[in-house]
């Protein structure tokens, strides 16, 4: 679900749930159940959000909807429900979302739940150690040293600013990269032999695996919370809000009989982590063409930066950085990608119109306005000076 879809669903839900006490959910629709006390409390949402209330974090729960939606919706819960436990609130909000979401969305949610349950109940993991974060085993020493003290000086000791909004650093050990590649291959074989259809990571990828669907979401969320979010709050404070709190994690493959390149696009993220896992390959360079907000995503290209991928090396970039991947010319290339999101930034973004702190288009417009204002002021002062001279003579 995109951020715009999430906001429209939230507005629709709010309007339908206000004052509602008689609508019943489809008895054939499986959904989370809350206690009767919670169900009674949640029937009537607030008309305006409680801005003083600090919402819970829901990223670690198995939810059918984006955790960001739960954080936004929580501000509209009645006071007596706000004092309930986090689980009770999550159940009540899940019930509301399932009741009032469009039928197509309910069907999508149900199908994805069944899809994931089928994988988790049948898939035989190849490397069990991948499913729990082991920093010493996964990361190179220089990366661990840099993040042991979350100061800007520490980060910059290993992190290079390749271009505005783009940072590179050594991150993953070769053994981890090879294990993850083998796990991805095992996932694909499982799908092939089970004769199941695979949900691909994005709409522009024909190949690749959503790692979260195979049970790696817990490990990746730990990676986000303990490492990527603290780093990003130093490097990208303008889009991290109070922290990055949810993710979409996947592996993408390039090569013969796979995707050969990746078209020009922006990610549905605040910050994106892209790590080359290997193998032997030629080509596949990443190219970046500037950070833009929604209003300027198709604006003129003035920024140009190309990056040659190195196994184990990470690229951490602004999610709104327009980018793509050039065609691979030989071998096979596998990447670990995490779209990292901030629910607090997305909530605040709804009320913003100017993003000149990070959008090249907004920055140019702001500069042009300032220059026009200076020019107009100079013209006024000139006229006043001319008028004063005329009067004196």
Task: List PLM regions with ranges.
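Surface-exposed loop/turn and secondary-structure junction residues enriched for glycine/proline
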Residues: 122, 207, 212-214, 265-267, ...
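Generic preference for well-ordered alpha-helical elements
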Residues: 36, 66, 70, 90-93, ...
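Non-heme Fe(II)/2-oxoglutarate
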Residues: 119, 127, 131, 135-242, ...
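Fe(II)/2-oxoglutarate
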Residues: 1-164, 358-368, 375, 379-393
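Short, charged low-complexity intrinsically disordered segments located at boundaries
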Residues: 209-221, 257-264, 366-371
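Catalytic core of non-heme Fe(II) oxygenases with the double-stranded beta-helix
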Residues: 3-13, 18-28, 38, 42, ...
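Generic hydrophobic, helix-prone segments enriched in Leu/Val/Ile
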Residues: 91-96, 113, 147, 207, ...
């Amino acid at each position: 679900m995109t951020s715009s879809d999430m906001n429209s669903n939230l507005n629709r839900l709010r309007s339908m749930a206000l004052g509602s006490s008689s609508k019943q959910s489809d008895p054939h629709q499986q959904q989370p159940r809350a206690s009767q006390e919670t169900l009674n409390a949640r029937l009537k949402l607030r008309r305006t959000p409680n801005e003083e209330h600090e919402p819970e974090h829901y990223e670690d729960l198995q939810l059918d909807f984006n955790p960001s939606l739960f954080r936004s919706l929580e501000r509209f819960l009645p006071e007596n429900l706000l004092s309930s436990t986090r689980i009770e609130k999550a159940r009540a909000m899940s019930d509301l979302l399932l009741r009032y979401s469009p039928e197509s969305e309910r069907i999508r949610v149900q199908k994805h739940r069944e899809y994931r349950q089928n994988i988790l109940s049948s898939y035989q993991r190849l490397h069990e150690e991948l499913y729990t974060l082991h920093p010493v085993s996964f990361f190179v020493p220089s990366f661990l040293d840099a993040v042991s003290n979350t100061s800007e000086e520490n980060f910059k000791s290993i992190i290079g600013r390749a271009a505005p909004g783009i940072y590179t650093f050594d991150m993953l050990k070769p053994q981890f990269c090879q294990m993850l590649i083998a796990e991805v291959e095992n996932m694909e074989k499982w799908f092939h032999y089970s004769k199941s259809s695979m949900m691909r990571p994005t709409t522009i990828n024909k190949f690749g695996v959503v790692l979260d669907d195979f049970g790696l979401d817990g490990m990746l969320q730990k990676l986000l919370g303990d490492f990527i979010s603290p780093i990003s709050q130093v490097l990208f404070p303008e889009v991290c809000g109070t922290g990055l709190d949810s993710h979409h994690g996947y592996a993408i493959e390039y090569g013969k009989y796979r995707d050969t390149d990746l078209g020009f696009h922006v990610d549905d993220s605040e910050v994106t982590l892209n790590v080359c896992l290997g193998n032997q390959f030629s080509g596949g360079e990443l190219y970046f063409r500037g950070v833009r907000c929604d209003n300027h995503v198709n604006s003129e290209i003035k920024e140009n930066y190309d990056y040659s991928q190195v196994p184990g090396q990470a690229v951490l970039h602004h999610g709104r950085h327009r980018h793509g991947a050039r065609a691979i010319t030989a071998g096979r290339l596998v990447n670990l990608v995490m779209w990292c999101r901030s629910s607090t930034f997305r909530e605040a973004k709804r009320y913003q119109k100017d993003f000149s702190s990070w959008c090249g288009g907004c920055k140019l417009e702001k500069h042009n306005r300032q220059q026009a204002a200076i020019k107009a002021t100079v013209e006024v002062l000139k006229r006043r000076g001319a008028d004063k001279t005329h009067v004196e003579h």
